[in-house]
Regions:
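Short helix-capping/hinge SLiMs at alpha-helix to coil transitions
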Residues: 2, 15-19, 67
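Short helix-coil-helix linker/hinge
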Residues: 2-7, 20, 86
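Short, cationic-aromatic polyanion-contact patches
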Residues: 3-7, 57-77
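Short acidic, hydrophobic short linear motifs in intrinsically disordered regions
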Residues: 20-30
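Short amphipathic alpha-helical interaction segments
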Residues: 33-45
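Glycine-centered, phosphate/nucleic-acid-interacting loop/turn motifs that mediate DNA/RNA or nucleotide
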Residues: 50
């Protein structure tokens, strides 16, 4: 699974939290100063890589998640475990419990 950019994660977090939505509805939740095309590009890329999908019958498109938040987090944790702890889950667990 592809690691998302901060902006892509921001969009996904909102859709996971609030459910399916249009690009226009995302803009005020992210940043009113961003142009429609900026958010639209992020959403279309998420659609292209399989994180989002949409219904083609209606305009504006209503985008909904194809990847659950839980699955994405699981993949992130696995990736960190592999990259930094040689897949040793015990070392990983120790690292995140150190205060």
């Amino acid at each position: 699974m592809k690691r998302l950019s901060n902006r892509q994660e921001q969009v996904m977090s909102l859709i996971w939290k609030y459910g399916p939505m249009t690009v226009r509805r995302l803009i005020p939740l992210i940043d009113e100063s961003l142009h429609f095309n900026t958010i639209s590009t992020v959403v279309r890329e998420l659609d292209r890589i399989g994180f989002l999908s949409h219904e083609s019958e209606f305009r504006p498109f209503l985008y909904y998640p194809q990847v659950s938040k839980e699955d994405y987090i699981k993949e992130l944790i696995e990736s960190i475990s592999v990259r930094f702890f040689d897949s040793d889950k015990k070392k990983f667990a120790e690292a995140i419990t150190i205060q």
